């Protein structure tokens, strides 16, 4: 019994000593723990909790520079109150939600000081592809998967239907490699 108690205390202390998700401030969160580095900017969600869709900006990169990781759009999920939510299709979002351009314009005006203080400053994030590109003359190409290798990461907008988020709620954004489900990354987001 005493051994079990000591083991439990060690687990609790180790978990407290090595937090997985860092709160970077200004609605930004990052996690360097898993094989996929993941940073999430949730500033737009926190500014507009009543929107029918939640916009998160995801920054992903591989921890091992020699590994090529491909994340399929179906392998990006939001877990809220124990329920897993998938992203809508691009067609569904464009049909049901006219606020995409407003979201992106609003996001451009948010401060990036929080997210840039994380590991993302060490990687390059090409803007040629996106899961949810805004329609326009010089828009990125819509893709169903994003790849990362070496010092090149993948940045994309991710939308989820709003399940009724409120201030103080916690949710988790999870991603995994298309070919190897053991290669994952996740970030816990606290809605403030």
Model-derived regions: residue spans:
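Sec-dependent N-terminal signal peptides
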Residues: 3-15
């Amino acid at each position: 019994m005493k051994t079990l108690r000591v083991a439990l205390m060690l687990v609790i202390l180790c978990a407290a000593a090595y937090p997985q998700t860092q709160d970077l401030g200004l609605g930004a969160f990052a996690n360097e723990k898993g094989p996929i580095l993941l940073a999430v900017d949730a500033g737009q969600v926190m500014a507009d909790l009543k929107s029918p869709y939640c916009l998160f900006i995801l920054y992903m990169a591989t921890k091992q520079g020699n590994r090529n990781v491909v994340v399929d759009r179906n392998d990006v999920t939001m877990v809220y109150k124990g329920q897993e939510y998938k992203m809508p299709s691009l067609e569904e979002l464009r049909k049901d939600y006219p606020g995409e351009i407003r979201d992106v314009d609003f996001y451009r005006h948010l401060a990036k000081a929080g997210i840039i203080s994380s590991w993302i400053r060490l990687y390059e994030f090409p803007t040629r592809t996106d899961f949810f590109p805004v329609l326009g003359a010089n828009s990125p190409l819509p893709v169903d998967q994003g790849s990362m290798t070496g010092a090149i990461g993948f940045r994309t907008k991710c939308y989820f239907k709003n399940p009724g988020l409120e201030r103080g709620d916690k949710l988790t954004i999870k991603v995994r490699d298309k070919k190897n489900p053991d290669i994952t990354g996740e970030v816990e987001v606290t809605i403030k």
